[in-house]
């Protein structure tokens, strides 16, 4: 059974990293429901913070389905941007500007290049949709940053 099995997935893609549709395509054929997908420009938003509208969607879907049923997938091109997004959906908006300011959801959050995601989806589809980006992204730094945020703030240790 996959970590993603039966979960509601919120996808926050990055124009310069992994776009939302690529992650959504990878999730086809496994037992998940993509409830929201967006592709943003992380560099374009204030200090790389998560878009305020996306924060609102994350908050609303978490209220609707329960934090235990939500997984957030990010596709940020840089470890720092991925970490800010992960921190926002776990510990609250670090910029204190959006709907998640001071809201500690503790959600499960993964980057598309992490082994937890890669191992849960069809490898051929992953290679077709995301594999090329692994060559240009600093995968090790992204994984390290995401693990650190989850260790500090995620409420679910599965």
UniProtKB/Swiss-Prot annotation:
Q: Does the keyword Oxidoreductase apply?
A: yes
Q: How does it assemble?
A: Monomer. Component of the glycine, sarcosine and betaine reductase complexes, together with components B and C.
What's this protein's name?
A: Glycine/sarcosine/betaine reductase complex component A
Among the Pfam families in the record, one is GRDA
Q: Which family does it belong to?
A: Belongs to the GrdA family.
Q: Catalytic activity, per the record?
A: acetyl phosphate + [thioredoxin]-disulfide + NH4(+) + H2O = [thioredoxin]-dithiol + glycine + phosphate + H(+); acetyl phosphate + methylamine + [thioredoxin]-disulfide + H2O = sarcosine + [thioredoxin]-dithiol + phosphate + H(+); acetyl phosphate + trimethylamine + [thioredoxin]-disulfide + H2O = glycine betaine + [thioredoxin]-dithiol + phosphate + H(+)
General function of this protein? In the first step of glycine, betaine and sarcosine reductases, the substrate is bound to component PB via a Schiff base intermediate. Then the PB-activated substrate is nucleophilically attacked by the selenol anion of component PA to transform it to a carboxymethylated selenoether and the respective amine. By action of component PC, acetyl phosphate is formed, leaving component PA in its oxidized state. Finally component PA becomes reduced by the thioredoxin system to start a new catalytic cycle of reductive deamination.
Annotated active site: 44
Entry keyword annotation includes Oxidoreductase? yes
Please give the Gene Ontology molecular function terms for this protein: betaine reductase activity; glycine reductase activity; sarcosine reductase activity
Its Enzyme Commission number(s) read 1.21.4.2, 1.21.4.3, 1.21.4.4
